[in-house]
Structure formats: C-alpha cells, structure tokens
C-alpha cells in the first residue's frame, strides 16, 4: 500500500522527470494551489515554464470540526503547471496514476468537461474534471486568462485532490483513516496529523475569529498592495493580495459579510490580483534582464 507521504513524493518524482521544476509550498495561506506565484504569475510569462509542488490549501468555510469524513477546512493539493501545454498532457497524467501503482486499464477514468473560473483572481480556463470510478480526483484547466490578461502561450494546470486520491488508493472511506506514514517505528494516520487542527480551526473560523481585526487586516493588506504596486513591486504586492484574500475567506466563514458586501470584497481582491498581473507582465523584459535571461 502506498502511504500519503509516499504518494506526494512519487508525484514530485514523476513530474520532475517530465521537466517540471519542483518548488516548495508558498508561506502565505491560500485557498488553492493556483494562488502560488509559481502558477498565477508565472502562467503569464512569454517564456516556457514548468513547475510542480505540494500546495497546502485553506478554505475556512469548508471546515466541519473534524466530524465529516470527506470535508476539510485545510487540505493538500498537488499542483502541476506546464507552459506551453504539451500535446500529450492527458497521457502524461494517466502515466502519473500508473506511477502511483494504479492499473488504469482496470478502472473507469473519465474526463468530464468542467470549465474553471476564479472571480477573485480574474482568471478562467477550459478544462475537465477527472473522475476515477465515479469520484472526482483531479481538475485539468487550460488557462485562457489570469488577472484579466490573456495567457499566451496557453498553460495547462493539473490539480490533484490528494486526499481523495489517497483514499481511493488505500481503500478507505474516511480521510482521517488515510495512512500518512508507516514503517518499523509504527503507523501514523491523517487523523493523527490533522484531526485536532480541523476541530480547533473550525471553532476559530466559525466562532472565535476577531472580525474587527480581520477587517483591519484586509484594509491594511489592500492598502499595502496598492503601495507596492505604486512602487513597481508586483511580487510583494501579490503577497499582500494573498493576505487580503485569506482575511476575506475567514470573514466569510464568520458570516461577518453580507451578500452585497461579499461581492464588493471579491471585486476588491480581484482589483489587487489584476493590478499585480498587469504590473508583472509589464515588467517582463526588465525582469528577464535582471535574472540574466
């Protein structure tokens, strides 16, 4: 049986062999792997770029106090971005499943059309969900636009739902029963690592989080992002955009934002993301000179 840790390592090994740069998780909370600058900003580059990484993801509204076997407020995605998109990307994906020990000839694997959109990032793309014997385990997206800008050449993003995939590979019905690691020293489960965190962060996100503080955090990050953009610094600006986005997500979980206000906050985050994307793209030639390209 493949453990959760082994699965993540093998995905990195497989995609490294396909030419992807293995980067590390980003150090700011985000709701999805797409938020990582290695995907969001680098997808706008005119030059080729390939990367893969584990993406710890936080979605405060999805927490269920550790009581739901299939729903988490924090989880792991495995993210792949390749630009330009290779013609054999579906075959490569199927090969990655085989590399994990899955005999794809013995399973029903379907690519179901499911176009993707992120209103807060001003991004959208054409793509599919990948269903493995009726369960969605991956999202494929051909980025058409990011931060309101066209992606040229088009990049392909693959996002593995790692917990779902591990549940399937291990034959367990609860995410908390996933074997995280097993060796001569003993066995560690997903529950050992994360169940208490699911309970405590659900309580925090739904009941305890100081909304006045979070509103201040949002405003501070919004203003700091604008200052960084004015200073010509898209990377620090984008950090502040991510901080604002996470503050908004926590406020949303606390039900501190009305339906009308919610749309306004989404538009504010989108304004920041678009500002970062536009400045990042405008500086491309200067940036390439600075890094010696």
Swiss-Prot record:
Any Pfam family: tRNA-synt_2e
Name of encoding gene: glyQ
Disulfide feature: none
InterPro entries linked: aa-tRNA-synth_II/BPL/LPL (IPR045864), Gly-tRNA-synth_heterodimer (IPR006194), Gly-tRNA_ligase_asu (IPR002310)
Gene Ontology molecular function terms on file: ATP binding; glycine-tRNA ligase activity
Keywords, ordered alphabetically: Aminoacyl-tRNA synthetase, ATP-binding, Cytoplasm, Ligase, Nucleotide-binding, Protein biosynthesis
Main location: cytoplasm
Glycosyltransferase found in the keyword field: no
PANTHER family per UniProt: GLYCINE--TRNA LIGASE, CHLOROPLASTIC_MITOCHONDRIAL 2 (PTHR30075:SF2), GLYCYL-TRNA SYNTHETASE (PTHR30075)
Gene Ontology CC annotations of this record: cytosol
EC top class named in words: ligase
Catalytic activity: tRNA(Gly) + glycine + ATP = glycyl-tRNA(Gly) + AMP + diphosphate
Biological process according to GO: glycyl-tRNA aminoacylation
Family: Belongs to the class-II aminoacyl-tRNA synthetase family.
Organism encoding this protein: Aliarcobacter butzleri (strain RM4018) (Arcobacter butzleri)
Name of the molecule in the record: Glycine--tRNA ligase alpha subunit
């Amino acid at each position: 049986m493949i453990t959760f840790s082994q699965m993540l390592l093998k995905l990195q090994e497989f995609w490294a062999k396909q030419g992807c740069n293995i980067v590390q998780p980003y150090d700011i909370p985000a709701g999805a792997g797409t938020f990582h600058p290695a995907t969001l900003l680098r997808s706008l580059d005119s030059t080729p770029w390939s990367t893969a990484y584990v993406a710890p993801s936080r979605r405060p509204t999805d927490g269920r106090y550790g009581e739901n076997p299939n729903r988490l407020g924090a989880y792991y995605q495995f993210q792949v971005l390749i630009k330009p998109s290779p013609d054999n990307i579906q075959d490569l994906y199927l090969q990655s499943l085989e590399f994990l020990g899955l005999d794809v000839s013995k399973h029903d694997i379907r690519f179901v059309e499911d176009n993707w959109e992120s209103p807060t990032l001003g991004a959208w793309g054409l793509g599919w969900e990948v269903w493995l014997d009726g369960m969605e385990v991956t999202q494929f997206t051909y980025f058409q636009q990011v931060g309101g800008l066209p992606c040229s050449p088009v990049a392909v993003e693959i996002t593995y739902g790692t917990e779902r995939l591990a549940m399937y590979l291990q034959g367990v019905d609860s995410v908390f029963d996933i074997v995280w690691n097993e060796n001569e020293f003993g066995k560690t489960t997903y529950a050992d690592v994360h169940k208490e965190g699911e309970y405590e962060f659900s309580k925090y996100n739904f009941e305890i989080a100081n909304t006045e503080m979070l509103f201040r955090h949002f405003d501070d990050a919004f203003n700091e992002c604008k200052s960084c953009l004015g200073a010509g610094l898209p990377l620090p600006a984008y950090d502040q955009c991510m901080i604002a986005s996470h503050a908004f997500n926590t406020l949303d979980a606390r039900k501190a934002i009305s339906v009308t206000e919610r749309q306004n906050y989404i538009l504010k985050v989108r304004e920041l993301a678009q500002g970062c994307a536009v400045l990042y793209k405008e500086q491309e030639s200067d940036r390439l000179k600075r890094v010696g390209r």
